[in-house]
Amino acid sequence: MGQPGNRSVFLLAPNGSHAPDQDVPQERDEAWVVGMAIVMSLIVLAIVFGNVLVITAIAKFERLQTVTNYFITSLACADLVMGLAVVPFGASHILMKMWTFGSFWCEFWISIDVLCVTASIETLCVIAVDRYLAITSPFKYQCLLTKNKARVVILMVWVVSGLISFLPIKMHWYQATHREALNCYAEEACCDFFTNQPYAIASSIVSFYLPLVVMVFVYSRVFQVARRQLQKIDKSEGRFHAQNLSQAEQDGRSGPGHRRSSKFCLKEHKALKTLGIIMGTFTLCWLPFFIVNIVHGIHDNLIPKEVYILLNWVGYVNSAFNPLIYCRSPDFRMAFQELLCLHRSSLKAYGNGCSSNSNGRTDYTGEQSGCYLGEEKDSERLCEDAPGPEGCAHRQGTVPDDSTDSQGRNCSTNDSML
């Protein structure tokens, strides 16, 4: 977000920086500028490189092109725009202690900042709903949320985020009326984000707090369902291992299918944990800033400008974290290694999401859906049924399954969803 203009000091400026006529303070000021420039440059490089890698991996490898990963792409795009159009100009503003890009770009820069944060948290809300549908209604999931519908949802997220961010700023609904703010608005070299109290509170609620409440509520429901499923897996595994060996042999499909289903569900829950880490990291990085933003809107001089800007940059750094979190996924790790030419030999068939069998035939591995624990006591179904002897069904799953059908073909699902 833009910097509040209630003070004239700058982020982490060293003591004595206001006495340029003294050699020691001037040297300290130069050292501070160089040090901060290096740190900020590394942040920008990490954001851009990491998110370009994520977007390229999903675009190149068909195995990663799942509904959930479409939303991950949207999130990576928001982070990439943050790294290209927001963070560098924010760094320049701090280091040069003035705005050098004109009043039009000042408003545009602030609008893009709000856009990226709003689009990110709205996308996280959509991912939470996506996972809720996948884990509670796996058999309806394919119809409820197709790839085309996912594209429409992503478009709506960006349109709504654009209206929330650009409209109030371009219409100047945010502007404060006190003298310091008016002087800043009239000066092109000033890009401090002075806001009136209604805008500060309303924008924080609409852009952050409301989506945050929705995200936390939906994802808490997802984890409640996941916990119940894990408990059923534990109970069912105990019953399975207690069965007589002869009974297991009489039912050739129940044993392996049961193990595959349990493995599938457990890895689905691991994927949920990864998405939970992404959402938790975003919340931890941005929540302090938006708390301060509300306080700043109510009492202008209560929060030092250094604290405001520092918390803003903590939020910026979040854009570099997500690519690191995606490395929890084996498929993302392999894709990153392939793109960086670190592990080419084992990824020959990776790009099209296919796996070759001993007969030289290739089977396509489908995309993800959720894990399901049915209530039927007679079948004790844990997830989707394993492929029958007719061949590999077009199963959907988030994790690899090393099973084969009766003809020796690989019926494994993939781990493309984190």
From Swiss-Prot:
Cross-referenced CDD domains, in alphabetical order?
7tmA_Beta2_AR
GO biological process terms, alphabetically, are: adenylate cyclase-activating adrenergic receptor signaling pathway; negative regulation of G protein-coupled receptor signaling pathway; norepinephrine-epinephrine-mediated vasodilation involved in regulation of systemic arterial blood pressure; positive regulation of autophagosome maturation; positive regulation of lipophagy; positive regulation of MAPK cascade; receptor-mediated endocytosis; regulation of smooth muscle contraction
For whether the record's keyword set contains Membrane, the answer is: yes
Which PROSITE patterns does its entry note? G_PROTEIN_RECEP_F1_1, G_PROTEIN_RECEP_F1_2
Q: Which Gene3D superfamilies match?
A: Rhodopsin 7-helix transmembrane proteins
Q: Which residues carry this modification: Phosphoserine?
A: S246, S261, S262, S345, S346, S355, S356
Do the record's keywords include Ribosomal protein? Answer: no
Residues on the membrane's Cytoplasmic side span: 59-71, 130-150, 221-274, 330-418
Instruction: Write out the tissue specificity statement of the associated record.
Output: Expressed in heart, liver, lung, skeletal muscle and subcutaneous adipose tissue.
Cited SUPFAM superfamilies: Family A G protein-coupled receptor-like
- Residues bearing 4-hydroxyproline are P387, P400
Instruction: State the GO CC annotations.
Output: early endosome; Golgi apparatus; plasma membrane; receptor complex
Q: Where in the cell is it found?
A: Cell membrane; Early endosome; Golgi apparatus
> SMART domains, from UniProt?
7TM_GPCR_Srsx
Q: Name one GO molecular function term.
A: protein homodimerization activity
Q: Where is the lipid attached (S-palmitoyl cysteine)?
A: C265, C341
Enumerate the residue ranges of region (Disordered): 381-418
**Listed InterPro entries:** ADR_fam (IPR002233), ADRB2_rcpt (IPR000332), GPCR_Rhodpsn (IPR000276), GPCR_Rhodpsn_7TM (IPR017452)
- Composition bias, Polar residues: 405-418
PTM details? Palmitoylated; may reduce accessibility of Ser-345 and Ser-346 by anchoring Cys-341 to the plasma membrane. Agonist stimulation promotes depalmitoylation and further allows Ser-345 and Ser-346 phosphorylation.
Self-association state and partner proteins as the record states = Binds NHERF1 and GPRASP1. Interacts with ARRB1 and ARRB2. Interacts with SRC. Interacts with USP20 and USP33. Interacts with VHL; the interaction, which is increased on hydroxylation of ADRB2, ubiquitinates ADRB2 leading to its degradation. Interacts with EGLN3; the interaction hydroxylates ADRB2 facilitating VHL-E3 ligase-mediated ubiquitination. Interacts (via PDZ-binding motif) with SNX27 (via PDZ domain); the interaction is required when endocytosed to prevent degradation in lysosomes and promote recycling to the plasma membrane. Interacts with CNIH4. Interacts with ARRDC3.
Family per record: Belongs to the G-protein coupled receptor 1 family. Adrenergic receptor subfamily. ADRB2 sub-subfamily.
Job of this protein: Beta-adrenergic receptors mediate the catecholamine-induced activation of adenylate cyclase through the action of G proteins. The beta-2-adrenergic receptor binds epinephrine with an approximately 30-fold greater affinity than it does norepinephrine.
For this entry, the protein name equals: Beta-2 adrenergic receptor
